[in-house]
A protein has these predicted regions:
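Short coil/turn segments at the loop-to-beta-strand junctions that recur within blades
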Residues: 1, 47-52, 88-93, 125-131, ...
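Blade-loop segments of beta-propeller domains
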Residues: 1-19
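Residue-level detector of Asp-centered blade-edge/turn motifs that repeat once per structural unit
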Residues: 5-8, 57-60, 96-99, 135-138, ...
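Residue position within the beta-strands of beta-propeller blades
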Residues: 12-14, 65, 104, 143, ...
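Residue-level signature of beta-propeller blades and closely related beta-rich strand-turn architectures
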Residues: 16-18, 47, 69, 108, ...
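Short, solvent-exposed loop/turn segments at conserved positions within beta-propeller repeat blades
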Residues: 19-28, 66-69, 104-105, 146
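Asp-box/BNR beta-propeller loop motif
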Residues: 27-45, 74-85, 111-122, 148-149, ...
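Blade-level signature of beta-propeller repeat domains, shared across WD40, Kelch, NHL, RCC1
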Residues: 169-194
Length: 194
């Protein structure tokens, strides 16, 4: 399942649950959105067709997604209504920084694209991450490595620094504009103040 936000709008994808409204799609949700803090959802596009495992929104409201059925990176400039191919990358997670650079957590290490996903290069000296997220203002990045180490890039171009560890495997992580980290792992939701 992928989840991201564009302003106050939540954009998500995945598989329907037992209580999911039929109009949201099956066997895949495609792109769905919520404008009321996830109280209700409506279909946007690719209903029943795609399951995006990774979604990321940029500061310019561009949206990138990796579907579970291919390595093709897709891009949308209209909050997910239409999609076009951007490039290819084998990744488990995506994030976009304030400069518009697209980061991909790949099995071979962190990669970055400065050309809207057309090409990717390896980020030297970056940790190997399986979770990756950007702060709402896109100035900070946070990630989790295979050993449970939490890493933060506090500003564009800055070095990655360790910021703590998870309790077992983590399923989700985020960072606030102020630098506070929220991680959901085997012990539940934990806040790591900066």
């Amino acid at each position: 399942m992928g989840l991201t936000a564009i302003g106050d709008t939540l954009i998500a994808s995945g598989h329907p649950g037992r209580t999911t409204a039929p109009e949201l799609g099956s066997p895949n949700l495609g792109i769905i959105r919520s404008d009321d803090s996830a109280r209700s959802w409506s279909p946007v596009s690719l209903t029943g067709e795609k399951d995006f495992h990774a979604l990321a929104a940029g500061p310019d409201e561009s949206l990138y997604g990796l579907a579970s059925d291919s390595i093709e990176l897709l891009r949308s400039d209209d909050t997910g209504q239409t999609w076009s191919p951007a490039g290819e990358v084998v990744a488990v997670n995506l994030a976009i920084d304030a400069a518009g650079q697209l980061f991909a957590a790949t099995p071979d290490g962190l990669q970055v694209s400065a050309d809207e996903g057309a090409t990717f290069t390896t980020v030297n000296d970056a940790p190997l991450l399986y979770l990756l997220a950007a702060s709402p203002d896109s100035k900070r990045l946070v990630g989790v490595g295979n050993g449970g180490q939490i890493w933060v890039r506090p500003a564009s171009g800055a070095e990655w620094v360790p910021a703590g560890t998870t309790h077992g495997s983590a399923q989700a992580i985020t960072i606030t504009n102020g630098g506070d980290i929220l991680v959901f792992d085997q012990s539940g939701l934990t806040a790591l103040p900066r």
